[in-house]
Amino acid sequence: MMPSARQVALANVVVDIEKGAARVGWDHAPSIYALVPTALLLSDPNLPADIAEQLRAGWDGSDEHLSAIIQEDLADDDIEQVLAHLAWPETVPGAAITVERIVVPPEVEDEAPEDPEEALAFVANHPLRTDVRLAVGVMRSGESWCALRTRAFDSDDKVGQGSNLVPALVDALRASLEPVTDEEA
């Protein structure tokens, strides 16, 4: 099955976000982005000329093409809490995030101490640890895309991609796009 134009646009912007994070380097706090149709941005008469020129340079001319607008850098230790309380206006059709994490094989996780601080130190200093950068994007219409880069294979041609590589992060980001009810407001 061929991916939809929206899925392709989402994949392209997520890969662009990840490449941008790679240019900055490792050991950075998470960043969150609003994903907005480029055509919508270009239709704004108040858009500064230099920004419009940059957008046009990367725009493929389609209505589905997305631009990422960075919102803020997030503290590394509260990402789940921030996503749980984040709400996007209805005018934002998608969102993305970049975050770095340490992963270890399941058997190493099983060996970790019960105490959360001790477990973090154990994993962070374990010889089988792997540093990864995740870029995840979701759309209100349901599409998702993930890009994963490891520090050990830090090259654009070694970035893993897929629609649901990090299900928990996809779900958390998708929840931030859900409409806020009167009870939650």
Task: Give the label of every model feature segment.
Residues 1-19, 23-26:
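Short N-terminal edge-element motif at the start of the domain
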Residues 1-3, 50-59, 110-119:
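Intrinsically disordered, low-complexity linkers and terminal tails enriched in Pro/Gly
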Residues 31, 52-53, 92-95, 176-185:
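A contiguous, surface-oriented mixed alpha/beta subdomain in the mid-to-C-terminal portion of proteins
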Residues 40-42, 103, 142:
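Short loop/turn segments at secondary-structure transitions that flank enzyme active sites
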Residues 106-185:
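Glycine-rich, aromatic-bearing surface loops/beta-hairpins
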